[in-house]
């Protein structure tokens, strides 16, 4: 039977994350069972044949990123990953932050003045100098805050000037509701304020922070000097999603096909139904829009569940007048 995932909210300097399948020191998600909650590792340990995933091995990490709508304080870390694979599906754009309906995601770098840099290495070093100049004033402001002191107008103006000079090197990718954003390894990226997404990622804590316009809480240093040498400067274009299945009121698209997990988007309209099997691994299922009827229950947007290994059933809308959009993820091992 499907097991609903009970989310955990994790505060962040830029907003919050809502975890559905995370198990680590910062939070342990649970299965909603019989009116109560059972932590994911507990139930994994007692279900035979790894039906809910291998005990002591993390599930594919499913979460919602919910940044604040205000510029700067709602922008995520500008960071890159060397092992962790990520994909975002945009579900909301704050209308005050982005009146035109298109939000932003910083992805890779661009040259503010191409003629000034004879080669790629010169460009990397110019970017590093811009970040280090901003980091110096950032640490000065953080030190004042730690003493309960407020910065003066000149310090605030210097922070703004150096932050904008640093950000001139980054490429801002426009995103809208429904867009899929695949984050390639070693590409610096930063989801911007007011852009709400569903994220699937490799369940490892690994990153290099290039910059952040607030005080970093999790480490006492930035990794810019090291990251600049290995980073990819440009993010490849986002490819069109392959359509795996299409029929009357039915569309199944492949969102990503990573070495460690796959994600598909399923859209059902009217009375369309889809027969589906979890196969040899568990599957994660998240409702993006509409209402799903499954296992005698109805699930609404931003509710998620784990389907045990070997599960088979029918996906259908609980409200035929409204399209049903789902995200389905399965591990590769």
Protein language model features and the residues they cover:
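Short histidine-centered beta-strand/loop micro-motifs
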Residues: 73-81, 273-279, 296-297, 316-318
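Ligand-binding loop in jelly-roll beta-barrel domains
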Residues: 83, 93-95, 187-206, 298-300, ...
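Loop-centered beta-sheet repeat module
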Residues: 148-207
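Short acidic-glycine-tyrosine-enriched beta hairpin
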Residues: 170-182, 293-314
């Amino acid at each position: 039977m499907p097991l609903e995932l009970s989310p955990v909210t994790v505060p962040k300097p830029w907003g919050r994350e809502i975890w559905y399948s995370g198990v680590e020191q910062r939070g342990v998600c649970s299965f909603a069972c019989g009116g109560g909650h059972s932590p994911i590792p507990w139930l994994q340990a007692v279900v035979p044949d790894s039906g809910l995933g291998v005990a002591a091995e993390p599930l594919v990490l499913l979460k919602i990123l919910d940044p604040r709508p205000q510029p700067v304080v709602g922008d995520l870390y500008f960071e890159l990953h060397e092992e962790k694979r990520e994909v975002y599906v945009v579900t909301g754009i704050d209308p005050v932050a982005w009146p035109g309906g298109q939000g932003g995601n910083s992805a890779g770098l661009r040259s503010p003045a191409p003629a000034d840099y004879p080669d790629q290495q010169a460009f990397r070093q110019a970017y590093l100098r811009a970040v280090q100049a901003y980091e110096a004033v950032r640490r000065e402001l953080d030190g004042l805050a730690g003493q309960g002191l407020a910065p003066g107008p000149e310090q605030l103006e210097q922070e703004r000037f150096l932050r904008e000079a640093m950000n001139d090197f980054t490429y801002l990718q426009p995103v809208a509701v429904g867009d899929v954003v695949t984050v390639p390894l070693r590409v610096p990226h930063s989801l911007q304020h007011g852009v709400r997404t569903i994220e699937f990622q490799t369940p490892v804590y690994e990153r290099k922070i290039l910059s952040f316009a607030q005080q970093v809480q999790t480490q006492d240093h930035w990794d810019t000097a090291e990251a600049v040498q290995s980073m990819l400067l440009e993010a490849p274009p986002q490819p069109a999603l392959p359509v795996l299945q299409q029929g009357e009121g039915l569309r199944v698209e492949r969102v990503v096909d990573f070495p460690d997990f796959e994600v598909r988007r399923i859209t059902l309209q009217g009375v369309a139904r889809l027969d589906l099997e979890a196969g040899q691994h568990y599957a994660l299922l998240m409702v993006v829009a509409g209402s799903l009827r499954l296992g005698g229950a109805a699930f609404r947007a931003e509710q998620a569940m784990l389907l045990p290994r070997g599960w088979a059933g029918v996906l259908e809308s609980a409200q035929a007048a409204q399209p049903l959009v789902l995200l389905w993820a399965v591990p590769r091992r």
